[in-house]
Amino acid sequence: MPYEIKKVFASLPQVERGVSKIVGGDPKGNSFLYTNGKCVILRNIDNPAIADIYTEHAHQVVVAKYAPSGFYIASGDVSGKLRIWDTTQKEHLLKYEYQPFAGKIKDIAWTEDSKRIAVVGEGREKFGAVFLWDSGSSVGEITGHNKVINSVDIKQSRPYRLVTGSDDNCAAFFEGPPFKFKFTISDHGRFVNCVRFSPDGNRFATASADGQIFIYDGKTGEKVCALGGSKAHDGGIYAISWSPDSTHLLSASGDKTSKIWDVNVNSVVNTFTMGSNVLDQQLGCLWQKDHLLSISLSGYINYLDKNNPSKPLRVIKGHSKSIQCLTVHKNGGKSYIYSGSHDGHINYWDSETGENDSFAGKGHTNQVSRMTVDEHGQLVSCSMDDTVRYTNLTLRDYSGQGVVKLDVQPKCLAVGPGGYTVVVCIGQIVLLKDQRKCFSIDNPGYEPEVVAVHPGGETVAVGGADGNVRLYSILGTTLKDEGKLLEAKGPVTDLAFSHDGAFLAVCDASKVVTVFSVADGYSENNVFYGHHAKIVCLAWSPDNEHFASGGMDMMVYVWTLSDPETRVKIQDAHRLHHVSSLAWLDEHTLVTTSHDASVKEWTIAY
């Protein structure tokens, strides 16, 4: 019973206000890479739906850069670990690992022969190191700064030069190898966020939080000019990137614009205004072949259009925070995946192409905990902002209507025919009919965690933290406790009725899935063991013969109802991140989401 990965819809870059985001390009110009959490994400620049995720860092990764040869990538994390790994194979084998200093690595630069690496950041005893890639032997010292170094670059032609930019408002110029400190450049009045040599090595540029960009001679370090005369931008500048022919420079700023500069005549060629919201601040940029990319504070990746500066060619959206829940729905013959994340953001994806967007208008303001689609084709979602929302899936617009405010925080919801929604909250079970609250059980006597409604619409199953499942009946506008207890093997974490209503599957914190037979008075049908840690989600296949479970052990199992031994085990479905939610597109296609903020589609063969 094999499986294979069909599609990966990758996460967006992880961004932080006021901190520049480094986006690296590959030397051949086909792909770009960035980091999110413990992952390094590699994406095809022409078709960003093609993605690969590297997850071998134990800590949050800050920066990753291709070697000029294109065969290796160096990535550095917050603990000061630098990993150099292979790009040619799917396994991304580790070549070398170094710890140049103890503390966050903020930038990496290679020499053009891919033999030496400079690493800078916030170490305890030093802020940078430069060494041979294969032995780790030092090839110089990075000195001259008394605060954290934000950026480093090396001239890509001999004689080598190295330049750094720091929070002490200075840039420093080095000659080598071995690299020795030559002089400090103190033209900026605020933090220096980014320093970059032009591809031909003739010049380098420094960009700072003071809104200025200075151009210098690449060989001597002499100042050539200040772009734009005095100020290049009205806000701090977080990133710069040279054009491949070394004549133009792209800059990204907190004033919510990106600009293209003609360096030879010192003038602005284009100004891209990205919006007026604080989330439109520009924190990163990349110029690769004909593509101009910028990164917004929202995490969105913008493909800029030189011919129409007011509107990007395309904007890549998705999630930059961990995904908590998902659901799938067919609309107009297409299958869509809906995913909700920790920051209240809901995204929808075309399951075939990976084309995606977020809903229009103002939606949830906190973590989306559970989503499902009701009989009217509305997305029903509950969130830690204490609301349940009904969103029309043809309009995909959060309007003022369709919001139900609850007294306490909801954890899970389920919908049934006849306009019913059952919501379990902290210490409360609420029944909604036609988007109105009609009944609640205020002190159920246990802590309800999850809920499912039988496809027939009369029975509601509620799983509790006490390890029991209780059954309720929907009678008009009330819920009646049937007084029946089904015992799970531990605190219930998720439950679901099969689509034909014949079985109820219950998973728990004790790593077990128990299936009850509905027709036989909810007698225990089978028990499924295999997970190594708490199971958090499960979903039935449309064939009602198989169901999938995902857990904190990063594993997904696809079980066969009749035989617990016949199973598909997807190891490391989302490596280093537990699986947060599952759904089936069809009998052989499973969708998984995780705290790594990515969505994956798997083909399952029985």
Swiss-Prot record:
Keywords: Acetylation, Actin-binding, Cell junction, Cell projection, Cytoplasm, Cytoskeleton, Phosphoprotein, Repeat, WD repeat. Pfam families: WD40 (PF00400). The modification Phosphotyrosine is found at residue 238. One of its GO terms (biological process) is actin filament depolymerization. Transmembrane segments: none annotated. The keyword S-adenosyl-L-methionine does not apply. GO terms for cellular component: anchoring junction; cell projection; cortical actin cytoskeleton; podosome. It is found in: Cytoplasm, Cytoskeleton; Cell projection, Podosome. WD repeats lie at residues 4-45, 48-87, 93-135, 138-176, 180-218, 224-263, 270-306, 311-351, 358-408, 432-474, 480-518, 523-561, 566-604. The modification N6-acetyllysine is found at residues 28, 81, 95, 115, 480. GO terms for molecular function: actin filament binding. Induces disassembly of actin filaments in conjunction with ADF/cofilin family proteins. Enhances cofilin-mediated actin severing. Involved in cytokinesis. Involved in chemotactic cell migration by restricting lamellipodial membrane protrusions. Involved in myocardium sarcomere organization. Required for cardiomyocyte growth and maintenance. Involved in megakaryocyte maturation and platelet shedding. Belongs to the WD repeat AIP1 family. This is WD repeat-containing protein 1. The lineage of its organism: Eukaryota, Metazoa, Chordata, Craniata, Vertebrata.
